[in-house]
Design a protein with these regions (language model features):
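A beta-strand edge to alpha-helix "cap/lid" segment located at domain peripheries
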Residues: 2-30, 40-137
């Protein structure tokens, strides 16, 4: 549960932590709980971009195919900058180690996360997600 009227950075941190927890549990309604209907996401696997909540929702089918509920989806190095109406957060994410918060194992990886949020009437909503990995070329 996200506490309203808290410092914006604390509210946003709680939203991102709840999102990551929902991902770990494969709880699609929890994943979507704080997202705008017109979300725009840039992801690592195709498609290049997903526009709107229905397209965003479809991207999780592929993720759930390879990520098991017992595997990590951990937030590391989270930084949040919040204004009155907009905010952004960046993090390094650990994905796919053998157990929650375990050390990275073969098949696990780190990726970069950037989230953009809008505040509408005191309700922070995720308007943009960008997932990326460094090029190995």
């Amino acid at each position: 549960m996200v506490q309203r009227n808290a410092k914006p950075e604390n509210e946003i941190k709680a939203i991102i932590e709840a999102w990551a927890d929902a991902v770990r549990r494969h709880d699609l309604s929890g994943i979507l709980a704080h997202h705008e209907q017109d979300i725009l996401m840039f992801d690592v696997p195709p498609p290049l971009q997903s526009r709107g909540i229905d397209e965003y929702k479809k991207t999780w089918d592929l993720f759930f195919k390879y990520h098991k509920p017992s595997q990590a989806f951990d937030i590391e190095e989270l930084a949040i900058t919040a204004g009155k109406d907009v905010a952004f957060a960046t993090a390094i994410m650990r994905c796919g180690s053998g157990t929650f918060s375990g050390p990275p194992e073969k098949g696990g990886f780190l990726f970069r996360l950037t989230i953009g949020l809008r505040n509408a009437d005191g309700d922070w909503r995720i308007a943009h997600e960008h997932h990326s990995v460094p090029s190995t070329d």
